[in-house]
């Protein structure tokens, strides 16, 4: 993942340089100005994502999570989960499970708040309630605080990734306009040169349509010597 982001970042920077070079000769072009702004934004978002990539597995809390999943979860299950905003445990429902990344999208019951949280941080309702009662209002441990901070950063990174996706779509929409701009610039540099079709009407009455595509369309057709005397019968053995 970090390697992919690094490649994308390099690509965005190269595109930004091209746009800035184009703006140096056409600083009032709205399409180019919009493209420059989008590229600058996506570059900053990608940098932020690179800086928030986790270097190790999310640490579990002392009283709430274990190092290995102890429950087989499925969509629709009720569970107890930690809310990243206050680090407290609340009842929630699993909306979606990402087995590859070991995460689940949950919605807190009675609140409607949605979050993406590691499966390791989920507990069955009864077990979670007991852990919450046992802990009471005890301050969060250092591991819990680290887990909360990382979860917050992860949630923020997901939003940034979504924004990058939106900007990518906008850039795709701008690609046609960008190509049109390049075509117009090329046409201006070639001003005075007329590109003729091979099917264009010749200027002289002796010219032939579609003949002489190398700049000789107005010249008469090449005359060939009559070779009818070389009949096949002359080639047959006597």
Swiss-Prot record:
An example of a Gene Ontology cellular component annotation for this protein is:
nucleus
Acetylation among the record's keywords?
A: yes
Spell out the Gene3D superfamilies in the cross-references: 2.30.30.140
Q: Which InterPro entries match?
A: SMN_Tudor, Tudor
User: Could you state a single Gene Ontology molecular function term?
Assistant: RNA binding
Q: Where is this motif: Nuclear localization signal?
A: 142-160
Q: The Tudor domain covers which part of the protein?
A: 72-132
Q: Where does the protein end up? A: Nucleus speckle; Nucleus, Cajal body
What's said on domains? Answer: The Tudor domain mediates association with dimethylarginines, which are common in snRNP proteins.
How the protein assembles, per its UniProt entry?
Associates with spliceosomes. Associates with U4/U5/U6 tri-snRNP and with U2 snRNP.
Q: Which PANTHER family match?
A: SURVIVAL OF MOTOR NEURON-RELATED-SPLICING FACTOR 30, SURVIVAL OF MOTOR NEURON-RELATED-SPLICING FACTOR 30-RELATED
Q: What is the similarity comment for this entry? A: Belongs to the SMN family.
What is the recorded name of this protein? Survival of motor neuron-related-splicing factor 30
Source species of the chain: Bos taurus
């Amino acid at each position: 993942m970090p390697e992919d982001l690094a490649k994308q970042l390099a690509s965005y920077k190269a595109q930004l340089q091209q746009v800035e070079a184009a703006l140096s000769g056409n600083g009032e072009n709205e399409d180019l100005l919009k493209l420059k702004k989008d590229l600058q934004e996506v570059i900053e978002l990608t940098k932020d994502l690179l800086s928030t990539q986790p270097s190790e597995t999310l640490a579990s809390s002392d009283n709430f999570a274990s190092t290995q999943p102890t429950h087989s979860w499925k969509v629709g299950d009720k569970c107890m989960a930690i809310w990243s905003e206050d680090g407290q445990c609340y009842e929630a429902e699993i909306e979606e499970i990402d087995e590859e990344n070991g995460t689940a999208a949950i919605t807190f019951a009675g609140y409607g708040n949605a979050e993406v949280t590691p499966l390791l941080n989920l507990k069955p309702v009864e077990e979670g309630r007991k852990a919450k009662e046992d802990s009471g209002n005890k301050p969060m441990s250092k591991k819990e605080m680290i887990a909360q901070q990382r979860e917050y950063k992860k949630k923020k990174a997901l939003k940034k990734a979504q924004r990058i996706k939106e900007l990518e779509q906008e850039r795709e929409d701008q690609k046609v306009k960008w190509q049109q701009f390049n075509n117009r610039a090329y046409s201006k540099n070639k001003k005075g040169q007329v590109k003729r079709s091979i099917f264009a009407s010749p200027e002289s009455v002796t010219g032939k349509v579609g003949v002489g595509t190398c700049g000789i369309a107005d010249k008469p057709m090449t005359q060939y010597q009559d070779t009818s005397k070389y009949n096949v019968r002359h080639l047959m053995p006597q």
